[in-house]
Amino acid sequence: MSLTKEKKAEIINTFGGSDKNTGKTEVQIALYSRRISDLTGHLKEHPKDKHSRHGLLKLVGKRKSLLAYLKNTEIERYRQVLADLDLRK
């Protein structure tokens, strides 16, 4: 269910440019998006899992705040992230 080291490193390399650039906003948004999609799949199988649903809502809120920050500071990077991750806004 959780991200493996390899998948996490792949996401970091794709959005950060190098494996050391983990603090970049795009990397954080991509990692949150991957965890959100994993949790969504889990909740489809286990609809009564309220604790996981609460965690999912927290992750969505964190991703939303990072997207808002990116939109206010770098609109072009924001649009690129939306296109790369197939997020709607």
UniProtKB/Swiss-Prot annotation:
Biological process terms from the Gene Ontology for this record are: translation
Q: Which Pfam families match?
A: Ribosomal_S15
State any GO CC term: cytosolic small ribosomal subunit
Q: SUPFAM superfamilies of this UniProt entry?
A: S15/NS1 RNA-binding domain
Q: How does it assemble?
A: Part of the 30S ribosomal subunit. Forms a bridge to the 50S subunit in the 70S ribosome, contacting the 23S rRNA.
The chain's coiled-coil residues are none
> What's the protein called, per UniProt?
Small ribosomal subunit protein uS15
Q: Which PROSITE patterns match?
A: RIBOSOMAL_S15 (PS00362)
Family the entry assigns: Belongs to the universal ribosomal protein uS15 family.
Citing just one GO molecular function, the answer is: rRNA binding
Keyword Secreted listed? The answer is: no
Sorted UniProt keywords: Ribonucleoprotein, Ribosomal protein, RNA-binding, rRNA-binding
Gene coding for it: rpsO
Q: What does this protein do?
A: One of the primary rRNA binding proteins, it binds directly to 16S rRNA where it helps nucleate assembly of the platform of the 30S subunit by binding and bridging several RNA helices of the 16S rRNA. Forms an intersubunit bridge (bridge B4) with the 23S rRNA of the 50S subunit in the ribosome.
Q: Which organism is it from?
A: Prosthecochloris aestuarii (strain DSM 271 / SK 413)
Which SMART domains is this protein grouped with? Answer: Ribosomal_S15
